[in-house]
């Protein structure tokens, strides 16, 4: 498996990132473990999840994919994997994400809450790559980044 540097970071990742958005709905935990094991055995070390997965999103299933990935992570050396996950920002129009009890703003409080929740579901003490699923056009990023 070829590898490349992840942006300007010191991380190197497999050329292929294993997406997990259907784990917990279309693909049960047994199926998900089989897929992730085969990917791992093929040299894929880069796995992507999100707090709102699986799809289609629902309040009942919110976070299930991260839970499945977290249980699978316990079967592998954590340092051998690059784990990416995402925070869901506020959507517009017909879809309201069932996240954080309806609090989907990307302010400092919600970002910290989402990170802690993802760490718990993933059963790890760090996330290698944390991204936003949707931007929050109302967020003042200067306020978010201030300690």
What are these regions (language model features)?
Residues 1-81:
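N-terminal binding-site loop/beta-alpha segment at the start of enzyme catalytic domains
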Residues 46-50, 82-86, 126-131:
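Short beta-strand segments at enzyme active-site cores
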Residues 68-72, 86, 110, 114-117:
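Generic beta-strand or strand-like secondary-structure segments
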Residues 21-23, 52, 86-90, 132-135:
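Active-site beta-loop-alpha junctions enriched in small/polar residues
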Residues 52-53, 75-104:
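Structural motif corresponding to the early beta-alpha repeats
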Residues 25, 54-56, 91-93, 138-139:
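Short catalytic/ligand-binding loop motif for oxyanion handling, primarily in non-cytosolic enzymes
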Residues 94-147:
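Glycine/proline-rich, positively charged
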């Amino acid at each position: 498996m070829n590898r490349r540097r992840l942006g300007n970071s010191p991380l190197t990742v497999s050329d292929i990132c294993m997406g997990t958005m259907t784990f917990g709905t279309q693909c049960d935990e047994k199926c998900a473990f089989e897929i992730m094991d085969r990917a791992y055995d093929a040299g894929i070390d880069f796995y992507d999840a999100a707090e709102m997965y699986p799809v289609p999103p629902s309040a009942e299933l919110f976070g299930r994919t991260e839970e499945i990935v977290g249980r699978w992570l316990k079967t592998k050396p954590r340092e051998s994997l690059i784990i990416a996950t995402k925070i869901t920002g506020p959507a517009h129009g017909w879809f309201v994400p069932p996240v954080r009890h309806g609090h989907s703003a990307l302010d400092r409080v919600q970002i910290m809450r989402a990170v802690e929740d993802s760490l718990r579901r993933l059963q790890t003490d760090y996330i290698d790559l944390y991204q936003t699923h949707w931007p929050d056009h109302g967020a003042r990023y200067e306020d978010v980044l201030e300690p």
